[in-house]
Every structure is written in structure tokens, then in C-alpha cells.
Amino acid sequence: LLLGVEYQAPTVKAGDKVQVTANLLDTAVDFTVESSLPSTHTPNIETDYAAINAQRVGRVLIDNTVTQVTQTKNGQVQTSDGLVLTESDIQWLPPIEIGTVFALGLNYADHAKELAFNAPEKPLVFLKGKNTLVGHNAQTRRPKNIEYMHYECELAVVIGKTASNISADEAKDYILGYTVANDYAIRDYLENYYRPNFRVKNRDHCTPIGPWLTRADQIADPMNLKLTTRINGKTTQEGTTNYNTKQKGG
């Protein structure tokens, strides 16, 4: 979540360009204006992604069709048939077809410190709808007459196969990969830190994510990734996933 800015409300205004990054993953960029993205294809995450021999996988929209892409060794964006895309012309989608989104509130010690709030002893879990996620370089609408639209740099963990009643030690075997996200919160509407309501966290396109899904076997230690937030090119937050207060879950 929020990293590296002590006791400061991390807000954005209309037109701000917000960039969140995680070393070894890549960037997600967001503009605070409205956007709309169609979807015409539903890949199977357990089969489609397992068959791809690439470190990073993403999804883009080409001629109104969802197309899977990979990143080449020299950083180019390429389709499965070898077409190399110009990144400035790409319309990015979230790197995977969205299923259930589980979120942990106040899951970083720095985030709790920024908000002058004691980190909880147990995870605060809430769900987000599919409508909340939007791709790299897309746009997010800032509601009118609000003061506290907070950016929240996140490491997103992508589960690659069905799991139920597994132990914490087994959990890593179900992780397909990782990506980076900006989980906006409209704190003007917050009634209770323990129960963020729909207007705070479940707005359309309020969570830019991607562009790349980095395979789990490419990340030696996901609890030692550097996270950075930049507003209009200026670094405003910096920290690591070591500050994650809940590194395992049952």
C-alpha cells in the first residue's frame, strides 16, 4: 500500500499522471480521467498462461479483440504470431482476465503509519469487483467535490489454479505470478477503516494494474521488492514489500 511518506495524505488532483513501479515487474500508469474498455475474450488462466514460455505476459486490445502478448528479451511487445507492437499505440488491458479480487486493508506498516493508524493484528480482507481494474496507461475518473483521492502502490499476487483449504506453506505453489497496481481509495467517503464501502474502493477503473504479469519463478523473493510511486515524474513514495505486515495467510 502506501510507502515512504510519513504522516502525509497522498492525494492526486484531476490531470495528474500517477506511476507505480515494482523492480523486476514493470510499471502501471494512470491518468485521472474517465475511460472505457471492451472485452471480447476470456482466456483460461490455468491453461493459457502455463503454456507460455515467457517471463512476462500481458493482454492488449487489437481491432477490438483481446490479444495475449509477451515481452521479448530486448523489451519489445510481441504477439504469439510474432507481430511486434509499437508500445505508444497499444491499448493495454489488465494482464489476466479478472476473477475474484481479494484485498488486504492496512497491509503495509508504512501505510498504517501514514494514516496514524495502528496496524491490525489480523488481516482486514475485503473484495473488489471486476469493474475496478483497468489496464496500464488507461484512465480513472476522479469524482467531483472530493479532496482525498489517495494513490496506493500495491504488489498484486495472481493465483493460477483453484485452491481451497490450503495451508500457508502450500500457498506459494498456487501463485502464477505477480504484477503491480495502484489501488485508489476515495477517503472522503470512508466511514470505517475496517469496512471500506463501495464508494471508497469499488469504483469503475479505480485500480490500474499491469502491464505485465511476471511469472512467479522469475521472482526469487517477492517479500523484497522495491515499490515506488511517482506523481508527474516526482517520486512521492518509496519502500519495499518487507514492510508487508501479513506475509502469509491461511
For the regions a language model picked out, list residue spans one by one:
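Structural signature of FAD isoalloxazine-binding scaffolds in flavoprotein oxidoreductases
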Residues: Q19-L25, A119-H136, Y151
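Catalytic-pocket segment enriched in acidic/His residues
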Residues: L1-D48, H111, R187-G250
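N-terminal accessory regions of nucleic-acid-interacting proteins
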Residues: S164-T179
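Ligand-binding beta-strand-loop-alpha-helix segment within the catalytic cores
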Residues: C153-L155
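Short acidic (Asp/Glu) patches
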Residues: L85-I90, H111, A119-P120, V134-I146, ...
